[in-house]
Every structure is written in C-alpha cells, then in structure tokens.
Amino acid sequence: MSHFAKVARVPGDPILGLLDAYRNDPRADKLDLGVGVYKDAQGLTPILRSVKLAEQRLVEQETTKSYVGGHGDALFAARLAELALGAASPLLLEQRADATQTPGGTGALRLAGDFIAHCLPGRGIWLSDPTWPIHETLFAAAGLKVSHYPYVSADNRLDVEAMLAGLERIPQGDVVLLHACCHNPTGFDLSHDDWRRVLDVVRRRELLPLIDFAYQGFGDGLEEDAWAVRLFAGELPEVLVTSSCSKNFGLYRDRVGALIVCAQNAEKLTDLRSQLAFLARNLWSTPPAHGAEVVAAILGDSELKGLWQEEVEGMRSRIASLRIGLVEALAPHGLAERFAHVGAQRGMFSYTGLSPQQVARLRDEHAVYLVSSGRANVAGLDARRLDRLAQAIAQVCAD
C-alpha cells in the first residue's frame, strides 16, 4: 500500500519556471525580465550599504537568539508603521494602529486572509484584474471567495471608470484589495483624484480596504508613495495594510514584512491584535528576527536612514530612467507611441501589451524572457542593451 499513490503533481510556479529556463539557456546575450527582483547596472541584486552597516552593528551588539514573540520585533513594528502612516499620524499617537511582523509581504497577506476568514466569516475579497497571481491562490488557500474588479482596458490602458463601476457592484461589507503604488503586474497607478473617487465608493459601500504596500519608495518616492495609504487610514475607521521590506531594503531572502491594522479605538486594536497573534501562532509561531532588526536599526538611526533613503531613491530613479530609455530606443522603430505607457508607469513592472505569442518569440528567437502575460520587470533591464531589446521587440511586433 502506498499512502501517496494518488498524490498528483501540480504545475510549477510559472515565473520560477521561467527563471529555470533562463538559467538553462546557453545563449550569452540572454536577458531576464521575468523574476521580480531589482538588479543594478551589473545585473546583480545588491545588498544595500545601509543594510551591511546595520548588520555589522547588530553582530557586534546582539546578545540573544531567543524568540521575538507573536507580533515580532516591537521596534521594527513601530518604525515600519511610522514609515507607512507617517510619524505624526493621529492613529499612531492615539494607539489606534500598530503592526504585526510577518515573514515578508506574502506572510502579511496570508495573515490578513486568515484574519478575514476567521473573524469576518462570509466576506469575499475583490482583486484587481489583473493582479499579482499569488493574490489569487493565497486568499483562496485562506478559504476566501475571490472575485475581481476591472483595472486595465482591452487596449492596455488604466480604466478608472470601469474600476469604479466594478467597485460599486461589490457587496456591502466585502474586502477590496488595492495596490498602494507600483501596481503589480501593470505598473499603472491611480492619480490622487482617482484615489479620492475610490475612497468615496469604498466609504459608501462600507467596504474594508486591504492595501498592498509592497513597493514603497519605488514609485514617486518614500513619502509620495504613502499618499493613498495615509488618505485611507485618515478617512476611514478601519483599514488593513500589508507592507514588505523585500524591495526597498533588498531583504528578499530574509522575509521581512508586516500587517498594519488601523482600528476605531485603542481598545478595539487590542482585540484585533490578540486575534492576529493567535492566527500567527498557527501559521509560523514567531517570525524571523534578523531582517526585522536590520530594518529597525536603519529606521532608528539618522545616519543609516539617510543613507538608505539615498539608496532607495537611486533605485527608483534608475528604474524611471530605464523606462524612458526603452521608449526612446523604440522610437527609431516607430514604436514610441505604442509603448509610451511604459514611460508613464511606475515601479518595477510594466504591462507591455505584448501578446503571449510575441513573448514566446522574444524568448525563442532573442533570448529575452518575459512573463507570458507581457509583464516585464523593468528593474531587470540593462541600459547598455536597450537598443538590442528595442530591435527584438520591433521584430516580433512587425510580423
């Protein structure tokens, strides 16, 4: 008898599978625009100098490897909440908001999903179409009914009117996931006026906003990218925010994130945090300490924080210049207007508008690897190879 005889193989993650194919490709001029990590001009995902310095200090000063507790590192939680909500936020001053440390932004999303399923039974969750694919499977695994609202039109443009109409149809009291900035996978972000209109619908429909804040600093700046989060937290009595330190601190493998909860009052926040600690205990017990201590050290030291802010701005500006550079490289091929949206998008990703067939040709004929949806990781571009990439895109678009 085999207990596992009927256990079937499931398909691998398509993005990780793309990485495997890229690694096995022998062509010297191959280009990886699939996996969502920041790369510098040398094609490396660097450790930030601020992180290195913080780690050196921690090694010299740390005195224990004991557990950090269900809510994680308290200094990290407080400082990350300040980064997201603002140090002068009334929610923090009145103890109506706090953060629970999680293993990355993905852990924060799963904790939010379990919280909704456990504490708000019957509530569905609504995601943008398209969204990060893991949103779908993660919330389904938590037992939530997953539905979608429109976000991008058939001609690959942000469709705010369709989005608002979709939000109006969401059942009262359901949860709506919103991307704070640097929308993944499209790169299309809402304007301030758009956000105010979304807020109006969320408030009237009494929806619970869950704001995914994975890319703070990669859009228009650390403070600018927090605008929508702070708007919703300031205008609504209850908000959930998931935060990630993978991108803006470069702590991908250290798994550093948090679920920030904004409540009506301090007493209710205590109730909510007791539930989060209970749920976290059954997910990961306590989160890893090292990365959180690094972030807390950086945000708590003016010198390290200043260096980190410079490094984040350097990554942000490089991504923005690569976007503009690609559009300019496409101009001689008569494609600048067709791909003008690439320059206007924000963050690491771009919904290029390329079809799955064109993406396949880029991979097979030109060793350029994109996700089949046409999503490209702009942060994986090499400024020295923009002309080659533009020529490859022109060829697959011409036929």
From Swiss-Prot:
GO biological process: L-phenylalanine biosynthetic process from chorismate via phenylpyruvate; tyrosine catabolic process
Modification N6-(pyridoxal phosphate)lysine, positions: 247
UniProt xrefs under InterPro entries: Aminotransferase_I/II_large, Asp_trans, NHTrfase_class1_PyrdxlP-BS, PyrdxlP-dep_Trfase, PyrdxlP-dep_Trfase_major, PyrdxlP-dep_Trfase_small
Location of this chain's protein in the cell: Cytoplasm
Taxonomy, superkingdom: Bacteria
Residues binding substrate: 36, 67, 132, 184, 375
Catalytic activity entry: an aromatic L-alpha-amino acid + 2-oxoglutarate = an aromatic oxo-acid + L-glutamate
Record-annotated membrane-spanning stretches: none
Keyword Iron-sulfur: no
GO molecular function, one term: L-aspartate:2-oxoglutarate aminotransferase activity
A Pfam short name: Aminotran_1_2
Cofactor: pyridoxal 5'-phosphate
Keywords: Amino-acid biosynthesis, Aminotransferase, Aromatic amino acid biosynthesis, Cytoplasm, Pyridoxal phosphate, Transferase
Enzyme Commission code(s) on record: 2.6.1.57
PROSITE patterns, per the entry: AA_TRANSFER_CLASS_1 (PS00105)
Any Gene Ontology CC annotation: cytosol
Membership in a protein family: Belongs to the class-I pyridoxal-phosphate-dependent aminotransferase family.
PANTHER family: ASPARTATE AMINOTRANSFERASE, ASPARTATE AMINOTRANSFERASE, MITOCHONDRIAL
Subunit structure: Homodimer.
Name by which UniProt lists this protein: Aromatic-amino-acid aminotransferase
Species of the source: Pseudomonas aeruginosa (strain ATCC 15692 / DSM 22644 / CIP 104116 / JCM 14847 / LMG 12228 / 1C / PRS 101 / PAO1)
Gene coding for it: phhC
